[in-house]
Regions:
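Catalytic cores of secreted or luminal carbohydrate-active enzymes
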Residues: 327-379
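C-terminal motif of bacterial Sec signal peptides marking the signal peptidase cleavage site
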Residues: 50-51
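Boundary/entry segment of secreted carbohydrate-active catalytic domains
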Residues: 69-124, 129
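N-terminal secretory signal peptides that target proteins for export/translocation
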Residues: 1-35
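Aromatic-lined substrate-binding rim segments of carbohydrate-active enzymes
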Residues: 113-169, 179
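Catalytic-core regions of glycoside hydrolase
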Residues: 202-209, 213, 217-349
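Extracellular/luminal regions of secreted and cell-surface proteins that mediate adhesion/ECM remodeling
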Residues: 365-508
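An active-site-proximal structural segment forming one wall of the substrate-binding cleft
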Residues: 144-156, 177-202, 235-249
């Protein structure tokens, strides 16, 4: 079987690094959708992908989505125009959603039963907290690096990815390390993080201060005085050292989350000038300031803007400022405003259970992060060997946030008798705008060689992972937010990690 994910490894893909800077917010209203969603058209021969890059062009088809599927005709169709039925079901998907904490220390005993329970509950993210208090004044030992690599591999084997946090003091005391020691530790961690990038979509900035939340540092990495004071100037220099070390040593495919928007505002006056540093709010929906997260409304506006392209996650809390904004109206409004991508399922329990009692927990779970919906597909129903096939796919992202991990849309032809599969890929699906109310169209071109096997081929669509370690594992494929058709022609295959469209191509 030949698959696009096998042909384009992450190292050779044109999907990373991301393009920046982005359009300023003041200009966004004047920029048409054609400028916001980049299309990579890929030309492929049957059986081998020839290119992973290409030109750009997109349009938005009118009235896409919401129509029942067509059935396969008794004779091969000359041209297919297929539509798909959206679904509001809460489909678990990688790189997004509620996360679970199965162990206090990620390097402690592996809780296989707890991880399995999390998987069965629909979780696809684990909290991975790594305690470094024993090495505040020393290099990390090889044994720790090896154990971290082992735990990340165990997460992958369980079908899970992680949101990673390194800290020296998970208490209010804030007994952390110096910025130079933190930088050295990150340099040591770099090879392990790079080798396991496939399972680390999110990482809190961590390391500094109490709970790794960048406040109350005992090593001068934070301050509480006036910004112009000497101690605060020194703390800012230390924070920049750690920020730069994070950017240099954490894989570019991993979203980094800073605790406070004030830091991002000092570093990047334009919220759209960078895309790697997002936010984690660990007292989400708690009081007027989210318990010190925001100093004023301008910081909330900045957070809403920066998370258009960088990830926002965290947890709610029970012992913060009052009132706690724990109603369904609160989470549905602020989840969308801040493009919420990942959130603690276990804390605060009173808040999460409250959403369930009020009847919105399933919707929060379904729309947190990205949510890709197929609207329509058009392609010829017949093709001669040696000809080029063009597939046009209309889809949209109706989730609260965009995709942050590189992904391509893959079209596959599966021979109905032999089962042979041929694939081609296109697009950088991170560029699909979130909360979309109209669809974007991606065009894929596939050249059929003279040696192509004749016969009827089913057309499938999928979004596999791009990393070698996970590309062929259907558990890491993105499930579309579409219902199976009642006639059985359109259906998601759990075993294959892709969607049968109900259309065919007769190759002759």
């Amino acid at each position: 079987m030949h698959d696009a994910a096998d042909a384009c490894s992450p190292d050779s893909a044109s999907l990373t690094p991301r393009r920046s800077p982005r359009h300023p917010a003041s200009e966004r209203a004047r920029v048409p959708w054609v400028a916001w969603v980049r299309l990579i058209t890929v030309t492929a021969s049957m059986g081998v992908l020839l290119s992973c890059g290409g030109g750009s062009s997109i349009s938005s088809p009118p009235g896409a989505g919401g129509t029942a599927a067509l059935t396969v005709p008794s004779e091969p169709a000359s041209h297919w125009t297929q539509t798909f039925l959206p679904s509001d079901a809460d489909f678990p998907n990688p790189d997004r959603g509620f996360y679970s904490s199965t162990t206090w220390d990620f390097l402690g005993e592996w809780d296989a039963d707890g991880v399995q329970r999390a998987w069965s509950a629909g979780r696809r993210l684990l909290m991975a907290r790594v305690q470094l208090d024993a090495w505040r004044d020393a290099d990390l030992p090889p044994s720790l690096l090896a154990l971290l690599s082992q735990r990340l591999d165990q997460a992958r084997a369980a079908g899970m990815k992680v949101t990673l946090l390194f800290n020296y003091d998970f208490s209010e005391a804030g007994q952390d390390a110096s910025s130079e020691r933190i930088r050295q530790h990150l340099r040591q961690l770099k090879p392990v993080l790079a080798a396991n990038a496939a399972v680390i979509p999110f990482m809190r900035a961590g390391f500094i201060g109490a709970w790794g939340e960048w406040h109350s540092s005992a090593s001068g990495n934070s301050c509480t005085g006036r910004p112009e004071a000497a101690a605060c100037a020194a703390a800012e220099a230390h924070r920049l050292t750690v920020r730069d070390a994070l950017l240099e040593n954490v894989p570019e495919t991993t979203q980094l989350a800073i605790r406070y928007p004030a830091d991002l505002m000092r570093w990047y006056s334009d919220p759209l000038q960078q895309h790697r540093l997002g936010l984690h709010n660990d007292c989400f929906l708690s009081g007027p300031s989210d318990t010190g997260t925001y100093e004023d409304e301008s910081q909330r506006d900045y957070a809403a803007a920066v998370t258009q392209w960088a990830a926002f996650g965290g947890e709610t809390c029970e012992n913060g400022e009052l009132p706690v904004r724990s109603t369904c109206a609160d989470i549905l409004a602020e989840g969308a405003r801040y493009h919420l991508a990942w959130l603690n399922a276990d804390y605060a329990p009173s808040v999460v259970v409250g959403w369930e009692t009020q009847g919105c927990l399933a919707r929060v779970s379904a729309f947190m992060g990205y949510r890709l919906q197929l609207d329509a597909l058009a392609h010829p129903g017949q093709a001669a060997r040696g000809e080029e096939l063009v597939f046009e796919v209309a889809l949209r992202n109706v989730g609260w946030s965009r995709l942050f991990t590189p992904r391509r849309l893959v079209v596959s032809l599966r021979h109905r008798e032999t089962g042979a599969v041929w694939s081609a890929a296109a697009g950088d699906l991170r560029d699909l705008p979130p909360q979309a109310t109209s669809s974007s169209r991606l065009r894929l071109r596939m050249s059929l060689p003279p040696s192509a096997q004749p016969g009827l081929h089913e057309v499938w669509l999928g979004v596999p992972d791009i990393f070698e370690a996970t590309a062929s594992d259907p558990r890491f494929s993105i499930r579309f937010a579409n219902a199976d058709s009642t006639d059985g022609q359109q259906a998601w295959s759990v075993a294959q990690g892709r969607f049968r469209t109900g259309t065919t191509v007769e190759v002759h």
